[in-house]
Amino acid sequence: MKCRRCRAPAVIDVRRHNAGFCAECFTRHCREQVRRAIEDHDMIHEGDRVLVAVSGGKDSLGLWQLLRELGYDADGLYVGLGIGDYSDRSGEFARAFAKRHDWPLLEIDLLDTYGFDVPRGARAAKRVPCSACGLSKRHVFNDAAVTNGYDVLATGHNLDDEAAVLLGNVLRWEAGYLGRQHPVLPAAPGFARKVKPLVRLGERELAAYCVLTDIDYIVEECPMAAGNRHLGYKEMLNQIEERSPGTKAAFLFGFIERGHERFADDAVDEREDLRPCSECGAPTPGDVCAFCRLRTRAAAQRIPLRAEAEA
């Protein structure tokens, strides 16, 4: 196979584009896809300070590098979730990447800062770990961005991630979630603008980008993610994509272009009646935000924190 652009030998084929690329042209393709996502959805404005949530994985580290290559003022944020050796190794990859490039990395440890970690939070909430993890990350990410004066919070959600989430929301007709499922969530009082610049790149493309640009990342999946239904949705979409390349992109982009607005009012309604949390000040529809309620439940657990994190 030849590179679509320069006709040199291709190192990767991107089936949904029906194209192969050499290493140099492929990395340029990745930059162009991110640039297009940013421009099409007005994600980042001139002079914006961007905080990139990094986990040590391919998507977030790749995103940080791509934003820097495109000239954006982007710093990193790593949140230690207390998931045993997995969190320890993830932090090592994030720190090594930041040190290699001499880029600022803000670090927040969930246990040290808030008194609990994901394993204890999951047990306290009596839910699957991903629920406690997602709630905690959303709160800490936004708080870090707002507190430290960043205009934009960027996350490494890619095309595969967003298509799987969309499938789950459609299967359950989650109107509020469908109204918020967009590459950009605008800034609001107490909220930084949230953007997903990788929405035009799939997991396989990002893995290839990291290999070709020598980004060292943690390969292992989170050990607490077993049973996450979105992994099942991803597998379903992968099977469809194998038979019909481009289906995931058509599904997601079709919704963004033609379906998202139909649910926009449901999302707006959920943000109209927000007030400051009585404990942390974060916007919430009730007196106490969900994160602070989780924190209170976790504090009531009697199991030693570090022991549970390492279990």
Question: Residue ranges of each PLM-predicted region?
Answer:
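Flexible helical/loop "lid" subdomain adjacent to adenine-nucleotide binding pockets
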Residues: R31, E39, H45, R49, ...
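ATP-dependent adenylation/nucleotidyltransferase module used to activate substrates
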Residues: K2-R180, V184, A188-F191, R200-T213, ...
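Short, low-complexity, intrinsically disordered N-terminal peptides in bacterial proteins
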Residues: M1-R5, P9, P304-A311
